[in-house]
Amino acid sequence: MTFEKYFDHIIEYPILFAIRDNYIEPNGQSFKDFILGNFTNLKDKANLKDFETHLATIFTEVRLKQYIEVRSLDACDWQCLCDGPAFFTGLFYNALDEAYEIVMKWKKENVMNAYLEAPKKGLETELEGKKLYEWGAIFLELATKGLSNRNQINSKGNDETVYLKHVQNVVKNKKNRAQLLLEQY
């Protein structure tokens, strides 16, 4: 998706509310209506704060704010709190081109099918001829390499790859948290 398509999606998305002195209901209007001054319950046009509020009400996997917010890891347990940010840091700062070369070949419908299948099949879900744990290993290797290249050393002499231990275990065991919980019962 290009930035232009993302922006079009965002402004066409129905606005949930606006805030002035109190909450103002939009009656199903889009943010584009608000930008154009066609917001029936408010005479003002939208401002930057309104746009930031609107963005906070859209729950896509990735959101563009003043930073890129990756939301897919917003419900993990204690062990993975550092893994997600470390994983994406390794990819975004040092291996983004390599990761892009992989995913650019994927078909959108196959990704969406895997997205819908994963809650049922876990890491056994197939995507483009590989199981998700296999893709996990590939991207984990890229993230690990990226973090190693950053060479950010802590007071104990370790680089940021120490924060990937939980993800390494998930990929190695080929089971996510839900699968492990199901095995207990």
Name every feature range the model reports, one short phrase each.
Residues M1-Y185:
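C-terminal accessory/tail domains of diverse enzymes
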